[in-house]
Each structure stands twice: as C-alpha cells, then as structure tokens.
Amino acid sequence: MHKIHVGLTGYVSIPDGGVFDDDLTVVNTARVSYNKKSDEWGDKDERLLKYLWDHEHTSPFRHASIRFEIKAPIFVLRQWMKHQIGCSWNEISYRYTQVEEPEVFYPGLFRSQDAKNKQSGTGILPLADQTKATEILHGGYEIAYRAYQALIDMGVCREQARIVLPVGIYSKAEWTASLQAIMHFIDLRLDESAQKEIRDYAVAIKTLAQIHFPQSIKLLNKEEFI
C-alpha cells in the first residue's frame, strides 16, 4: 500500500490491488485500431502517448484506473465529488454510523476574502485574528457536536441528527477513477485558482498516480517536453 498524509490527520492511499493496468495499456489500447501492440515501453510509445493527450484522443486513458482511499474534511470531499465522469464514489454515511468524538479540520492559516474573486481567499489574516478565528472555529465544532449528541440522546434518528454536523468533520471515502479522470482532477485542482485545502490533496494524488503511471502523469508537466 502507498499512503501520503495530508495535513494533521488526512491522507490519500492506494490499497493493495488498487491499480489497474499501466502506461503501456494506454498506448496499446490506441494501437488496437491497427492490430498492433508493444511489449516493452520505448520512444515510440512516449511519442504516441504525448500525441494522444495533446490532440485530446483521451479514450485510451479511460482503460486504466486507480482506486484511492481518502480521509478528508467533508467540505473538501464535496468539491472533489463534483468530478463524476469516469469515477465511482463510496463514502462513510452518518445515516448508518454514529459519530463518536469526530476528528475536525483546522486550517494551518486563515486567509482573508479576495475583494475581487468571490470564490477564493487571498493573503493571510493577522496573527491576532488567526488565534481568534481558531477559537471561534473550535467553539463552533463543540456546539455542533453537543447538539448532535443531545439529539441522539433524546432518541432522534441518526439520519436526522446528522443535519447539525459541520462540514469540517473528517470523513472517509473510496474513489475509483479512470486515468483520464485522475489527470483531469490533477490539472484542475493544482491550478492556483483552486482552494488550497483541495490543492493539497491534488498534490498527494499526483504523487501516488505518478508512481504507477509515470509517463502519463508526466504529460501534465509541460516543461519536461520543452
């Protein structure tokens, strides 16, 4: 198993048996049209792989896939789950599982709101505000969990008691994605406009994917072909 920790308690891992095929599968799938295949990776394969990606002939990249195990805050997973094409998701459900002393997310640093871009933060809050923001967040988590526990104790069903839970709680999910979907995720979520918290996970995904599909993931590093 390969595993990369993200933040204090999050992680991304590939379980044993979670990798399906390799770079050679991609180019050999493309060669089916000519009834040809390669047995070993060579320069012709690298050129073909680059041609396929550069010209958006992406169907061969959908024949390979990876299954990831993920532990991340719910708000990160909700962004991540917008990636649906070529993907399959399963996540812990707090309808079936009661939350016991939840693990919660704290930012390393709080950012200020960008005055022009409504969807992103920019810069870092002053130190005094960092401390206060952390205290406010911690208090919010405590209030939410006490409310959840009170609802459970009075007999409210789990599927309704969970309504009060914050999106900063960590959850676990399994994500199986085609190589094309993985590369698309990396390309989008490593962009500087992406939220830092999901960008940290995209770094981990890229690092793990590159172990098993080095030639394909290299296509995302355009400077390597200059």
Positions of predicted regions on the chain:
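Family-specific signature for flavin-dependent thymidylate synthase
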Residues: 1-226
